[in-house]
Amino acid sequence: MNKNIEMGISTRERIVATARELFAAAGYEGTSTETVLEKSGISRGALYHHFASKEAIFAAVLEAVEVDVAATTARAAANARDPVEALRLAFASFLDLACGQEVRQIVLIDAHSVVGWQKWREC
């Protein structure tokens, strides 16, 4: 892979990882793009090269959290003996995640108001 492409992916991942921590801790309203810049060590130009707005950063964070939630619940259900047990294990796994600060703040509290109800339902 081209070195510039690799650096771009790395920069984007760093922005998302930093914003994920900040949004989980302080919520969407309590997190500024300035704080994301400071904590990630990314330049303003690099941030806006990858994301058009704070909302776009949040959408990328939401997608990453949703991917992790789906993977975790799928792993929990993978060893089930039957479909009912798989549902029970997946749901229990989701409830455990939902009790955690990250999923509660990003997915359950902020997502519908930041990205809109329709997009939130599609996640």
Pin down the residues of each PLM region.
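Short, intrinsically disordered or compositionally biased N-terminal tails of bacterial proteins
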Residues: M1-E6
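Short, solvent-exposed loop/turn segments at secondary-structure boundaries
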Residues: M7, R81, Q118-R121
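Alpha-helical structural segments
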Residues: S10, R14-E21, A25, K39, ...
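Short helix/strand-capping hinge loops at secondary-structure junctions
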Residues: L22-T35, F51
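Phosphate-coordinating loops and pocket residues in cytosolic domains that bind phosphorylated ligands
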Residues: G30, E38, A59, L108-I109
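Short hydrophobic/aromatic patch on the recognition helix
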Residues: G41-F51
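Short secondary-structure transition hinges
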Residues: L95, C99-C123
